[in-house]
Amino acid sequence: MRRRRVLVLGGASAASGAAYWFSGRSSEELARDERDREAVDTERDDDGSEPSDEDGSADETEPENGESILADSKGMVVFTYDDSPIEDYTLAYEVHSEYDVPGCTAACPGYMKRRDDYLDPDQLREMQADGWGVMSHTYRHRSLGRIGLAGPAHAGDDRLSVEANRHGAIEGDPLVVFDDEGETAATVAGRGSDSSGQYVELEAPLSEDVDESGYVRHPESFIRDVLRKTDAQLEAWGLDVTGFVYPYGRYHGVAEEVVRDRYEAVANHRYGGGHNELEGLDPTAMRRRYVETDRATEDDVDAFMETAADEDVLAIVGAHTQYDTLTEQRVRYTIESALEHDLAIVTMEEALAELERR
C-alpha cells in the first residue's frame, strides 16, 4: 500500500445517538475461551530466556520533512485489531489495502509461533512494511488486571471461586491472592466452572485465608517479565512495537502501573468512549470504541465518526477479526465512514507523532 500522507474525501452527515459503551461477553469471546482450553499450547518459557532472532525489518513510515499527516483532515482515528489471528491478514489487511489506509495489530507472539490460525511473523512484517502498526497484547493473551473473588478463600483450599477464571488459562502461572489484610502465593493448575460459578484450580492448597472482598492477580514481577518477553520476541522478528492493548480489557490494579510505565500509549486503559480529548491527553490512559456488529450499529459508527470530526479528539476503534460479528462489510463501512467524515486513518505511532507537533 506504501503509505498515503493525506486522506481527504467529501464529508457526509451522520446519524446521532451512538451507544458508546458495550459491556458483557459476546458469544465469540466464549468461543475463544473454549479454543484456548483445547489448544495444545503448554510451553513454559516465561523464565527470561531470550527468543531466537530472525531476519526482518519494518520500513519507516514517518512523513517526510516533518509535515503533518492531517493536512486538511478534520481529525484522526486509529483502527486496532486484537490478538493477531490470521484474519488480521486475510480480512482487515486486505480491506484496508483497498482504501490505502493502515490499521494496528495488537499481537500475541506466543500464539503466532505455535498456532496456524494466527499470523506468522512474515505476514506481520509485510503488514508493518506496508504501513501498519504493531502493538503489544501480551505473549499468550494473559489477563493482567486483578479479578475479584466470588467467595472467601480459606487455608487448605485448592480452588478459588472467582468472578471470571481468566487467570487460570495457563497451567503453572504464578498468582497472588490478596485482600486488605495480606496476601498469599499460589500456582495455576487449571480452571473451570460449575453450578456455583467460575473457579481457578491451584497446584497446592492455600496457606492463608483471604476474605471474599479479595482479588487474584499475577505477581508484579511476572507481569513485567511477560511484557518484556512479548516485546523482545516481536522485536526479534524485526517489528517495531508502539503501545499496548489489555487482553479482555482487564486493567485493574498493579498491572495498570506496570503497563503505563512500559508503554507510551494504551488503547483501552478504561472501558467505553473512544474519543480521547487532545487537550491534556495522556496517551497511556486512552479509551476505544468496539465496532463489531453486535456492539455497534451503522448509525453508531457514523455518529462516532461525526463526533471525531467535530471535536478535538483522537478517536480509537477496536475489533476482533476472528469474530463472526466483524464482517468484511463492517470493516468497509467503518473505514468509509471515517473517510467520509474527513478523518485521517493513522497508526498509533503516527498519532503520537502528530500529538508531539501540537
Please provide the spans of the model-predicted regions.
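Interface-prone segments of viral and bacterial extracellular assemblies
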Residues: 149-154, 166-169, 207-214, 220, ...
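Acidic (Asp/Glu)-rich catalytic clusters
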Residues: 93-100, 116-136, 259-260, 276-280, ...
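N-terminal secretory signal peptides and thylakoid transit peptides that target proteins
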Residues: 1-13
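Small/polar beta-strand repeat architecture
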Residues: 184-222
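Catalytic grooves of carbohydrate-active enzymes
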Residues: 77, 83-87, 297-349
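His/Asp/Glu-enriched short active-site or ligand-binding loop at hydrolase and phosphoryl-transfer sites
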Residues: 107, 138-142, 250-251, 255-301, ...
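C-terminal segment of N-terminal export signals and the immediately downstream linker at the start
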Residues: 21-73
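Active-site beta->alpha N-cap acidic-glycine motif
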Residues: 59-170, 174, 184-185, 226, ...
